[in-house]
Amino acid sequence: DYLKDNAWGYNRVTDQTVRIVSLYAQNEWKNKKWGILIGGRLDKHNLIKGLIFSPRANLRYNPSENVNFRASYSYGFRAPQAFDEDLHIDNVGGTVSMIRLAKNLRVEKSQSVSLSADLYRSWGDWQGNLMIEGFFTDLADVFALKEIGFQDGVLIKERHNESGARVFGGNLEGKVAWRDKVQVQAGLTAQNSRYKEARTWSDEGGVEAIRKMFRTPDLYGYLSASYNPIKRMQLSLTGTYTGSMLIEHHAGFIDSNKSVETPDFW
């Protein structure tokens, strides 16, 4: 993957070549009640010293045809490289801001565990499904942005490593269908996203050190419904809910930088 970007007016040139060679293997054993999957991927990334091994495992148990339990584990990483969003040039309170990578940016690593239960049921012409899931992710050397000041009139945000973060919570999803006419599906997620150590997002005095991650609501969900009155016609209704979240409010309209909670919205 080759990425080259020249922002002529802002004295920024991005010239990056990414080469990844991967080897993937997995083995699965299953019968009607049990399923076990074990696998792993070996990656060689030209921006990372050495090889990275990413294991994964999945365990399934079906006590009956209508009940399905799962447990899974996975490991992942993000390389210290420029991503598409790093090329965006933002306007913050009338001031242009850009992202750059810290010189000593390290690999971000993650380990995730999840437990889930799927329940299925039929009542005549009706079918239903309920899924309950709990998840936990531990991030080491997690990427984060921090304002470090102005350079040639441009506000510089630097992507660097924090010590780590944890994300955990649960999902609840349900689906109900009547024949091939009506289908309703809804889901709700409650989660907690926190850095392991409090951090500030700006060097400006007065910005409080916090652990909560920005732009990560603790509650969000969705709803979708469809109705097929005739074979070639479908009526659809969709909606999403996003709970309150913490964001950075930059100086300009207000006197100084501060962190604020947004209202929830549909």
What are these regions (language model features)?
Residues 62, 70, 104-168:
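Membrane-embedded beta-barrel scaffold of Gram-negative outer-membrane proteins
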Residues 19-25, 40, 53-59, 69, ...:
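Hydrophobic, lipid-facing positions within transmembrane beta-strands of outer-membrane proteins
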Residues 2-6, 31-33, 40-46, 73-79, ...:
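Transmembrane beta-strands of outer-membrane beta-barrel pores
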Residues 30-35, 129-138, 158-251:
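Gram-negative outer-membrane beta-barrel transporters
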Residues 2-12, 48-54, 82-88, 95-96, ...:
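Outer-membrane beta-barrel translocator domains and adjoining extracellular loop/strand segments
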Residues 35-37, 58, 62, 68-72, ...:
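Membrane-spanning beta-strand positions in outer-membrane beta-barrel proteins
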Residues 14-56, 60, 176, 181-192:
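Surface-exposed extracellular loop regions of Gram-negative outer-membrane beta-barrel proteins
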